[in-house]
A protein has these predicted regions:
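Extended, amphipathic, non-transmembrane alpha-helical segments
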Residues: 108-114
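Short linear capping/connector segments at secondary-structure termini
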Residues: 117-124, 155-157
Length: 157
């Protein structure tokens, strides 16, 4: 049996300091509303004329615009992902662990703004949004633990 895994703990929004942090995050998100988000194909930003509006289901506010890709751009992105996978498949366990831990650290560092955007874009409440972020952290941390154990020849269960 594997030991050492602990689930991420959800933010307690009854604490005043956390309420202030999420309220500041909402201010930041509203200030960023209306931004255009480009495609990223092979690491390069690509803006397109056609955009898809992200609209809050609760307020109907336009939160931003995602660039819409053509079939050719989708094909190009798929090709780029295959190339990235080839490189990633040669990446050492240590480097994969480093990358995943960095991802988890970035999620924690940006937790409140991530929660605020999730609330605005999905209509979820604060706790549900943070619960989803915790689930992301749990998956990442679980993957890290499992790849390290596989590298040591341990079984997953």
């Amino acid at each position: 049996m594997l030991t050492g895994f602990k689930n991420a703990v959800e933010v307690d929004f009854t604490l005043e300091e956390n309420k202030k942090k999420i309220e500041e995050a909402f201010k930041q998100a509203h200030a960023e509303a209306g931004a255009v988000y480009p495609l990223i194909i092979g690491g390069k930003k690509v803006e397109t004329e056609k955009k898809i509006a992200s609209v809050s289901p609760a307020t109907k506010e336009v939160l931003g615009y995602a660039c819409s890709c053509s079939k050719e751009q989708a094909d190009e992105a798929i090709k780029a992902s295959y190339e990235a996978f080839k490189k990633w498949s040669l990446t050492s366990v240590e480097e994969r662990v480093r990358v995943l831990r960095r991802l988890a650290a970035l999620l924690i560092e940006n937790r409140f703004i991530m929660d605020a955007w999730n609330v605005l874009e999905s209509g979820k409440n604060w706790g549900e949004a943070d619960g989803e972020l915790c689930e992301q952290l749990d998956f990442i941390n679980s993957y890290v633990m499992h790849i390290q154990n596989l590298e040591k020849g341990k079984e997953l269960v």
